[in-house]
Amino acid sequence: MSTTRTLLPVIDVNGVSKVFNAASPNPVQALHDVSLSIHRGEIVGLLGTNGAGKTTLIDLILGLTTPTSGTIQVLGESPHTAIKSGRIGAVMQSGGLLPNITVKETLELLGAAFPSHRAFDDIIERANLGDILSRRVSKCSGGEQQRLRFGLALLGDPEVLLLDEPTTGMDAGARHHFWETMREEADAGRTIVLTTHYLEEAETFAQRIIMLN
């Protein structure tokens, strides 16, 4: 791999603004002229007050919405292309789960979407899912569902992990296990971007903090 390619940012956000309901009498400016670069192996925390645009920025990097102006590249590609190739994994605050199947069935169903994936035993251990495998998703607590989302994010062995309030609903023990696992993932060279309202978590885990306001 060339030195130039190694130094290219994994995530490159250039002059991005996002306005919701732009054509209405009351448009909402979620982000204004945001630029940032995140490099391979970095652990970066996105902090800001409610409404600062943290989740909107994560959604943009994931290609779930498009910027009103500016550009975003992930691993040198459009967010949509990077997601489609399985190079990005994400843990979101809510949604994305089928309530009427078990945790194990969820892993198997999503695993089938990848040409190849990490071993289920590895995912189960790293996401601490062993005690809830046979439980229906609808019967899982909020913290248990977050653990499942984390496992699903790791399935495709992604190069980038985006974590939007990943420990929401987790008890102290589950949060500790989660961050220990995240450190191991970062040590393996994965790039990690997280939002959290737990300032102590961000200061402890992130190598760099970016404030949005």
What is the predicted role of each segment?
Residues 49-53:
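Walker A (P-loop) phosphate-binding loop of ABC-type ATPase nucleotide-binding domains
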Residues 70-80, 84:
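Conserved ABC transporter NBD signature motif
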Residues 161-165:
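Catalytic Walker B motif of ABC-type/P-loop ATPase nucleotide-binding domains
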Residues 157:
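Conserved catalytic motifs of ABC-family nucleotide-binding domains
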Residues 62:
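Helix-to-loop junction immediately C-terminal to a conserved catalytic motif
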Residues 108, 112, 117-133:
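Conserved ABC ATPase "signature" region
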